[in-house]
Swiss-Prot record:
UniProt keyword annotation of Cell cycle present: no
InterPro entries reported for this sequence: TIF_eIF4e-like, TIF_eIF_4E, TIF_eIF_4E_CS
Gene: eif4e1b
Tissue expr: Ovary, muscle and testis.
Coiled-coil positions: none
Name of the protein in question: Eukaryotic translation initiation factor 4E-1B
Single Gene Ontology MF annotation: translation initiation factor activity
UniProt: mRNA binding residues: W53, Q54, W99, E100, R154, A155, K156, G157, D158, K159, T202, K203, S204
Subcellular location, principal: cytoplasm
Organism: Danio rerio
Length: 214
């Protein structure tokens, strides 16, 4: 009987022991984005004389992180590649790139005019530096007075304007102008002017007087 029992035990199929694969416990870090102090909107304007001015202006997108800014910047045309009559505008969320907006109507702009021959040498660089000043709050505590910036591509020459909210605040406006000029690496002997939107809107000719210069 004992030998028979041994034979029966031997005939019982042995269970296969599955070897567990070793999987290291790797913690996947979430993709961390770096928030900006303000949310910004990028606008595009293309001149179509058959439409009202406002109908030619459209909001491309809004962003509020460093990564989203670069993702946007690297996937749109550079200003130097735009057709004549086109604009880019970047403004704080809630502000539209027009004089009539309540955040702009009492303000003005620091204006840089570039000759046509500088379009492929300086224009893109100056525009990028301007954007970095905006999103990086590059004007210290005076950044709260910044509304946004506009770049105009025109046949006769291009313009970059930095808009502020209060044209009467001399200390704030002049500080921003000096800091902006420094950030762009402009020579000291080069003078740039600040124009109040109210003066630009009521000018009698093509020239608007400068309220401040640096």
């Amino acid at each position: 009987m004992a030998s028979c029992a041994v034979q029966l035990i031997d005939k019982v199929p042995k269970k296969k022991v599955e070897k567990k694969k070793f999987e290291p416990n790797i913690l996947k870090e979430p993709c961390m984005k770096h928030p900006l102090q303000n949310r910004w909107g990028l606008w595009f304007y293309k001149n179509d004389k058959s439409k009202m001015w406002q109908d030619n202006l459209r909001l491309i997108t809004k962003f509020d992180t460093v990564e989203d800014f670069w993702g946007l910047y690297n996937n749109i045309q550079l200003p130097s590649k735009l057709s004549s009559g086109c604009d880019y505008s970047m403004f704080k969320d809630g502000i539209e790139p027009m004089w009539e907006d309540r955040s702009n109507k009492c303000g003005g702009r620091w204006l840089i005019t570039l000759a046509k021959q500088h379009r492929h040498t300086e224009l893109d660089h100056f525009w990028l530096e301007t954007l970095l000043c905006l999103i990086g709050e590059g004007f210290s505590s005076f950044s709260r007075d910044i509304c946004g910036s506009v770049i105009n591509i025109r046949a006769k020459g291009d313009k970059i304007a930095l808009w502020t909210s209060n044209a009467e605040n001399c200390e704030t406006v002049t500080y921003i102008g000096r800091k902006y000029k420094e950030s762009l690496g402009l020579p000291q002997k080069l003078v740039i002017g600040y124009q109040a939107h109210a003066d630009t809107a009521t000018k009698s000719n093509s020239i608007t007087k400068n309220k401040f210069v640096v």
